Amino acid sequence: MMSKQNKKDWKKFKDEHKEEHKVENEILEEETDEESQHQEPALGHPSYTALEEQLTLAEQKAHENWEKSVRALAELENVRRRMEREVANAHKYGVEKLISALLPVVDSLEQALQLADKNSDPSMHEGLELTMKLFLDALQKFDVEQIDPLGQTFDPQQHEAMSMQPAPGAPPNSVITVFQKGYKLSDRVIRPARVIVSTK
């Protein structure tokens, strides 16, 4: 049996130990509270909402960059086509200025041929005719074609009407006189034919 004194000592020991344990628990709770306050959510990672916002921004940026690259490629393709067209036109129409400068020479030869006819000089006429043929053959090698529309229907794309006159027996809107022949380089008119057109 425990004596009174022993009971007292045991009670005192228990109370002291209880108090100590209580203080330790309080300290532990305080430390845990402090740690939880300083700790970021989800072990230091940003929240789901923040990640979602970052993903949306990244997707928008990627879409913008994709659109820019598509536009840049389209522009590059347009530039390539334009350059190809310009090079092709340079090959096709590069001699246009030279041909235009030579056309008055052809006109002069034609006028000389008409005068030679009037003067009835066969040798002069033959020489001019040969020169004219050589000249036109040379122009043909450069894809130059003469427009001589006498009797044809008036075409404003290739003919320039100097005047309109009634012409019995001729269909309306047809070329009845050619003042000056026209010329085409490939499919481009470099000088329209100057003509008189019949009326109704």
Curated annotation (Swiss-Prot):
GO biological process: protein folding
PROSITE patterns: GRPE
Pfam families: GrpE (PF01025)
Gene Ontology CC annotations of this record: cytosol
Basic and acidic residues bias (residue ranges): 1-25
Gene this protein is translated from: grpE
Keyword Glycoprotein: no
Entry's localization field: Cytoplasm
CDD domains per record: GrpE
Listed name of the protein: Protein GrpE
Molecular-function GO terms, alphabetical: adenyl-nucleotide exchange factor activity; protein homodimerization activity; protein-folding chaperone binding; unfolded protein binding
Function: Participates actively in the response to hyperosmotic and heat shock by preventing the aggregation of stress-denatured proteins, in association with DnaK and GrpE. It is the nucleotide exchange factor for DnaK and may function as a thermosensor. Unfolded proteins bind initially to DnaJ; upon interaction with the DnaJ-bound protein, DnaK hydrolyzes its bound ATP, resulting in the formation of a stable complex. GrpE releases ADP from DnaK; ATP binding to DnaK triggers the release of the substrate protein, thus completing the reaction cycle.
Region entry Disordered, spans: 1-52
Similarity-based family: Belongs to the GrpE family.
UniProt keyword terms in alphabetical order: Chaperone, Cytoplasm, Stress response
Subunit comment: Homodimer.
Matches recorded under NCBIfam families: PRK14139.1, PRK14140.1, PRK14144.1, PRK14150.1
